[in-house]
UniProtKB/Swiss-Prot annotation:
This is tRNA-specific 2-thiouridylase MnmA. InterPro entries: MnmA-like, MnmA-like_C, MnmA-like_central, MnmA-like_central_sf, Rossmann-like_a/b/a_fold. It comes from Magnetococcus marinus (strain ATCC BAA-1437 / JCM 17883 / MC-1). It is an enzyme of class 2 (transferase). GO terms for cellular component: cytoplasm. The gene is mnmA.
Length: 358
């Protein structure tokens, strides 16, 4: 009789990762539950928030592990999270860009540190509750594909996962939709089958960026000038941390035509605004591109690209650059291309690679 494979499940206390653990137990795997403790849970706002690392979530994950009868461990990565995600979040805003902390967390914490912990515990692979699909080509090379439910596909958030990491990662929910996941959790008698999804950046409870910056980075709330494209002052902003490209609300400017944030000028502490048509651009530059190809491409190729999670993929030409970046040329101009965010490109439903918008 062969020994069942050991699998570690990244358990966040949500329905997706809990259903993942239950499904793998049912399939006969030897399952270990792992939860990352990432942020100080002492704040009452964090404890009751809809973030992904609230105190209630640790309790829920532990209770699910007890229900399933699996070993369960909490791994403290608070210092790593602070440096790699929170400090980067602050520094990115200070540079006049808009960060994507969930991608950074996946890159540095979940699929690096936690994966190494899982393997050290003797697991054959790490499973997560992401809605994405891992496949292998004819040569056994791992590939990352979009989840089968377009409304829940999370492959965009996983583009930094390396091929070496993909060899030891699984996404059991990739072929399912959210309703099926909830039904699965209900079938296993998990108490959180109807639990709400996390919505907020986990260290910014209730999405109150001003309160977060006031405590963690007050320099990002330094007022400065709101200027038009010609440099004329139109008013005063509340600090660069309160704005992002494409934003209209909260500018507090009386103007005959609607104005939108076009760029954040960090050296001069200015918010540059303009009309809606000025938001459209037909190209962008990426740095730190991660290729999910056995041999990274060197020649331009046609692709479908996403400039943000909620955006549909659009036709584009990807031109790899010798410095490890890429130039992306869109067939049609795209609205509010935002420095600091990610652009991910696909061959059909397969992730080819992605990088960070300059």
């Amino acid at each position: 009789m062969t020994q069942p494979q050991r699998v570690a499940v990244a358990m966040s206390g949500g329905v997706d990762s809990s259903a993942t653990a239950a499904l793998l137990v049912e399939q006969g795997y030897e399952v270990i539950g792992l939860t990352m403790q990432l942020w100080d849970h002492s704040s009452p706002k964090v404890a009751g928030s809809r973030s992904c690392c609230a105190l209630d979530d640790l309790y829920d994950a532990r209770q699910v592990a007890q229900t399933l009868g699996i070993p369960y461990y909490v791994v403290n990565y608070e210092a790593d999270f602070r440096q790699a995600v929170v400090d980067d979040f602050i520094q990115t805003y200070a540079a006049g860009q808009t960060p994507n902390p969930c991608v950074r967390c996946n890159q540095i914490l979940k699929f690096d540190l936690l994966l190494k912990k899982a393997l050290a515990l003797g697991a054959d692979f790490l499973a997560t509750g992401h809605y994405a699909i891992r496949r292998e080509d004819a040569q056994g090379v791992p590939q990352l594909w979009q989840g089968s439910d377009p409304a829940k596909d999370q492959s965009y958030f996983l583009f930094t996962t390396t091929m070496a990491q993909l060899a030891h990662v699984r996404f059991p929910l990739g072929e399912m939709d959210k309703q099926q996941t909830r039904q699965l959790a209900q079938r296993f008698g998990l108490h959180l089958s109807t639990k709400q999804e996390s919505q907020d950046v986990c260290f910014v409870p209730d999405g109150d960026y001003s309160a977060f910056f006031a405590k963690q980075a007050p320099h990002l709330l330094t007022p400065g000038a709101i200027v038009d494209q010609q440099g004329h002052s139109l008013g005063q902003h509340k600090g660069l941390g309160c704005y992002t490209v494409g934003q209209r609300k909260g500018l507090g400017i009386a103007h005959p035509t609607p104005l939108y944030v076009l760029a954040l000028d960090a050296p001069h502490n200015q918010v540059i605004v303009g009309p809606a048509e000025a938001l459209y651009q037909q190209q962008l530059t990426l740095h730190h591109v991660n290729w999910l190809e056995p041999t990274p491409p060197t020649e331009p190729f046609a692709s479908m690209a996403k400039i943000r999670y909620a955006a549909p993929p659009v036709e584009a030409r990807v031109e790899p650059l010798p410095d490890g970046g890429a130039q992306i040329y869109f067939n049609q101009p795209q609205r509010a291309i935002t420095p600091g965010q990610a652009c991910v490109f696909y061959d059909g439903a397969r992730v080819v690679g992605g990088g960070w918008i300059v």
